[in-house]
Amino acid sequence: MVKAKYLLALAESGTVTAAAERLGITQPALSRQLRRFEEELDLELFARAGSTLVLTDAARALLPTCRRLLAEAARAGRAVEVLRAGTAPALRVAATPTTISTLLAPFIEEAGSAIPLLTSIPTSHYEVFDALEGAADMVIAPIPPGREVASLPLGSVPVRAWVPPTHPLAVERGGSTTVEAERLLQERLALPSRSSVSRGVIDSFIGSAGLSLGPHVECDDTATLCALARAGRAVALMTELQPGRLVGFDIVAGGESIGGVPLVAAWRPGHFAGEEIAQIAGRFRSFIEGSLR
């Protein structure tokens, strides 16, 4: 386990000197441990490139396994802590930055001491499940889970158009809660980038309606999208549920409404706090349902 940690340190630090400093050991000691690791595995893990030690293809192939071993060791240590204390420690939840700021953080605040202490790990939309191989105890994902994880559907969060109450779009709607996509596309839009699931929902809906995007800017930070809308610089299309000082509209075209972003909670089967995580996921689903009313 220690040698796996040393190999990862070298891979992530780039040089033996930097890895040794990171690990708090001397460079000769690290070099000896790495050579011993090679001998134990009977594999060539390192090659010289001038004065630099670089990883071979065999070493790089071992890195995912090393990461899993260290993550499992950390989880085992935390499980022991739980058994000693009799209660779950702080649990780590991986999710996209938007999900964290608009849903998870408000949920943590509202739930208070009724749930175990939760902390968040920001991750990208399409790599969220990878966090379960690392430090995350639970993930909130906008993409479907695989069969290898335990999961609970949380519902769908709608993509809506948001403007300040004084915006011409809000004034002309006269209290209506919907806006035609064709009319919406006459405005400058502020959209999430194509690295987000919500942008895929937007593009698919507009394309299916036979329309195309006009002037727009892209940003993956929800606070900035809200700021652009409040400043009257653009109409924000986003999954924020209840942004202050903005009014929202459901987007329609040809009698069809734009879809939402489906969310799912997932965790590893057999997790030491699996029962608590399932209960948290259920409460989180109820929180989302209540926020959408």
Predicted segments — roles?
Residues 40-41, 62-86:
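Alpha-helical linker/hinge and terminal dimerization helices associated
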Residues 251-293:
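A late-sequence structural motif
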Residues 122-186, 241-242, 246:
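Acidic, Gly/Pro-rich loop/turn segments at junctions of secondary structure
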Residues 88-146:
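Central regulatory/effector-binding core of bacterial HTH transcription factors
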Residues 169-181, 187-209, 273-281, 291:
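Secondary-structure junction motif
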Residues 124-128, 135, 142, 195-252:
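Hydrophobic hinge/microswitch elements
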Residues 38-55:
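A short LG(V/I)-centered, amphipathic sequence patch enriched
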